[in-house]
Amino acid sequence: MESSKKMDSPGALQTNPPLKLHTDRSAGTPVFVPEQGGYKEKFVKTVEDKYKCEKCHLVLCSPKQTECGHRFCESCMAALLSSSSPKCTACQESIVKDKVFKDNCCKREILALQIYCRNESRGCAEQLMLGHLLVHLKNDCHFEELPCVRPDCKEKVLRKDLRDHVEKACKYREATCSHCKSQVPMIALQKHEDTDCPCVVVSCPHKCSVQTLLRSELSAHLSECVNAPSTCSFKRYGCVFQGTNQQIKAHEASSAVQHVNLLKEWSNSLEKKVSLLQNESVEKNKSIQSLHNQICSFEIEIERQKEMLRNNESKILHLQRVIDSQAEKLKELDKEIRPFRQNWEEADSMKSSVESLQNRVTELESVDKSAGQVARNTGLLESQLSRHDQMLSVHDIRLADMDLRFQVLETASYNGVLIWKIRDYKRRKQEAVMGKTLSLYSQPFYTGYFGYKMCARVYLNGDGMGKGTHLSLFFVIMRGEYDALLPWPFKQKVTLMLMDQGSSRRHLGDAFKPDPNSSSFKKPTGEMNIASGCPVFVAQTVLENGTYIKDDTIFIKVIVDTSDLPDP
């Protein structure tokens, strides 16, 4: 960028920026405002630095002053404030938007600076205040380019030349036709005389005896000109004769036999076309009949689809009733759990009583041995403590059983999809390595409320071929309440998946179709069948070095395809 002093020198050539009209409210005078940055006008005297923007280094336009005392153009300040942490380009102080204000005093001083007219290069020698530039260009400058006042003319001329252009040089000025005396734009005068003027003298194009006539009379003359070419009235039937009106009459009188033959040929051709149309009509009728048959077939299919829709609606209603029934069961379970909660509270109370009794026993044991009655009381208290301990044990067992049942109900799914969350991966993996707990079973899941009962089984340290190197994942069919109503062997497609907990979601998965001859997919005779799946599902190095483990937790997903599964 050139320095501001070079740009402000009186002899420097400058390119003025695009301008928009803006009203100075403080002075009531219209002034020019650049679209961006400060003024690039040619000033008569070198402009002081205090009148220049600290960002664009041009003469300030609508100056704004910051808290640190530096000035910026309004558009430059807006650009600075659009950043996340605006700073003054002069002193690097932070700029606070609410503490930036308009510097109207500086603005008035700048608008009073003397400049050369923008049209100096065209010959204008005017020197004026910057604030008067717009009025000068709009009303007074003889060297300002203005558009021609005629709407169709696109030329621009200097204000001093505008009158001569409009009256003498504009191609769209009015001109008078020398033949018809009508007013025509100068640019269209020649075309008017050559093709349109009705008063221009023309000759007959057929070289008849009439040599001169007006263009307005030509149309009527051509309709009766003896030399005008014409065609035989039997042209549509194949006659190609052409000539003057007199020749046409003589031809028609002498060629009657030829014309009759042409009529015969035309009639024969017409009969052939009628025959073809009849054949086409027969084919069309066949097509129409075929389309009618298709429509009937479609109507039958639509009725069948409607019946299927009604059946599906009844199934949906049945499922809704089942869901309502399950909701009622959950409510009943909640009611059953409430007494156990009360028992738990009673157990807490009993524990407090036991602690109190133990304290009393301790006190009694420290009393003099001669107190025989105390010994008997101690025995009685010990028996009471024993009964309380038994009751607490029973309550603990019943609460644990209810908690297990409730957890199974909470985590069970009935859409053929299992998402199994395995916490404490490192501890469980170490237990598998040490041989304490080789495998883990997931909670059961189902293909429907009355469908197959299934679960997943995982070996964190691998099994068989994958032992010590891989995670082994298997699918297990369990004995369900509704197995008697389901088709066997189990045939649904199974997808096993290890879920990626990172943002890329690059899950690892494998899918298989059950082998109908395998005992793993027969109807269970025990609690569950033999597991079937992938001994080398994923290498432990891949599992433990990726984003498959977060917060010492992994997620395993099993999907059973239920799309073709019939209702029981």
UniProtKB/Swiss-Prot annotation:
Gene Ontology terms, MF aspect: identical protein binding; protein kinase binding; protein phosphatase binding; signaling adaptor activity; thioesterase binding; tumor necrosis factor receptor binding; ubiquitin protein ligase activity; ubiquitin protein ligase binding
Outcome after substituting residue 441 to A: Abolishes interaction with RNF216
SMART domains found in the cross-reference section: MATH (SM00061)
Phenotype upon changing residue 338 to W: In IMD132A; likely pathogenic; decreased TRAF3 expression in response to stimulation with lipopolysaccharide in patient cells; decreased expression and attenuated TNFA production in response to lipopolysaccharide and M
GO biological process: apoptotic process; cell surface receptor signaling pathway; defense response to virus; negative regulation of NF-kappaB transcription factor activity; positive regulation of type I interferon production; regulation of apoptotic process; regulation of canonical NF-kappaB signal transduction; regulation of cytokine production
Region spans: (Microbial infection) Interaction with glycoprotein N of Andes and New York hantaviruses: 392-415
Effect seen on changing residue 512 to E: Abolishes interaction with LTBR, CD40 and TANK
Disease: Immunodeficiency 132A: An autosomal dominant immunologic disorder characterized by increased susceptibility to infection with certain pathogens, including Herpes simplex virus and Mycobacterium abscessus. Immunologic work-up shows impaired production of cytokines, including INFB and IL6.
Name the UniProt record assigns to this protein: TNF receptor-associated factor 3
Gene encoding the protein: TRAF3
